[in-house]
């Protein structure tokens, strides 16, 4: 397996958009299908899934995966952290599509304080929080959430 740096991943994404050509939303859909496939081959549809998403493209990926897993019969609870009320274009498109299809077990858009759901060893957490673009230490509520997730017994799939 080749492990790429954040800069290499962004460069490959841009190369694909420039040379295939493919719209960034379609590239996100393609990546989300691959993530969904990886999850469905490893986890039964009876496990509870909790998705944490931020307003950027990692969150857009996570929301698309939420939709796709729900279409396959998985029980998904999705949480989108939209504290500042601004989403990336692709995140907004995936949020709107997720809400309009109405297949997820629950969808919550967090705009202020947040009490995380209980995570057990049966839970699969899909981490659509921050990826390779994060260039500073986490602080505040996100630092607490990541600590909570990491200290849980849940299984975790991180998206980037």
Language-model-detected regions and their locations in the chain:
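Positively charged, low-complexity intrinsically disordered leader regions
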Residues: 1-45
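Glycine-rich phosphate/dinucleotide-binding loop and adjoining beta-alpha-beta core of small-molecule
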Residues: 2-4, 43-159
